[in-house]
Amino acid sequence: MVQSVLGSLVLGYRPLWGRERSLVGIQLFVRSDGAAQVDVAHLLHTLQEIWSASSPPLLLTPQTRQLLGDMLAHAPRNAPWICVPGPWLAESAVYASVQAAHQRGLRLVWRGELGNLPEPDIARCFDNSLLSLRPEDAVAALQAAPPARPGAPPVAPQGTSPVIDGQMYENVASRALMEHCLDQHKALALAGWPVEDVLYSLRHQQMQPAHAIILKLLKAIEAEQSLEIFEDILSEDPLLAYRFMV
């Protein structure tokens, strides 16, 4: 049965990173495979079965209005967070489904641009937001809290940051903006990571495996754990995994 319901879907994922720079959740994108009818109730039950208590929380992100409507209608109260695109709420059917789901106790996340927040009567239906930063938002945020540069005098802040405390953010393109969201405004999570900017800032440094993973591996070796345990630990660090593969 698991194979049948997952076989009718196209799935994608994106890590959600927290203030400790560790994984705090997974955004799971869900789309039906062609014209196949998706049994959403069965899908939610399957996820509940295969997702253990130690697994990171899920943010379900349906890619079609039909899937969203089915999730809002059939999800139980203890279901994962469900992401709702802000522009879709202009349709009365979607808005009515969101209101009904909120009244049933579902945890909903509004997704849209920081500069186009929902009205209060809509916002109260949502537990959190996944906000997209526009270029002008990024500029305003960094001007309000200019990042320190080694050897340079501090720059006076200009204006106030548009970043809202405690929300989730996406389209964060720079390391400085990432630190601004997570550290200064206590963002709940960052969807994705400013990979290109981080790699560029480390271009002259030789990367090393994470110290915590090395210690964990040494303890497993001392305890004479199985090869499977060693492989699991190695897989937690990309650099270690690559070195042992080659």
Regions found by a protein language model. Name each.
Residues M1-W81, G86-A100:
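Bacterial c-di-GMP phosphodiesterase EAL domain
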Residues S32, W88, P135, A173, ...:
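Flexible, active-site-proximal loop/turn residues at the rims of small-molecule/cofactor binding pockets
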Residues A41-H45, A90-L106, P147-A152, F230-L234:
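Hydrophobic transmembrane alpha-helix bundles
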Residues L59-Q63, P80-A90, G105-G115, D127-A138, ...:
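Catalytic beta/alpha-barrel core
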Residues D70-A73, A93-A100, P118-A123, A140-A145, ...:
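A short acidic, amphipathic alpha-helical/loop segment
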Residues R77-W81, Q103-L108, A123-L130, G159-V163, ...:
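Glycine-enriched alpha-helix->loop->beta-strand junction motifs that scaffold or abut catalytic
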Residues A90-S92, L114-S161:
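Bacterial c-di-GMP phosphodiesterase catalytic domain signature
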Residues P146-V246:
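Conserved alpha-helical "signature site"
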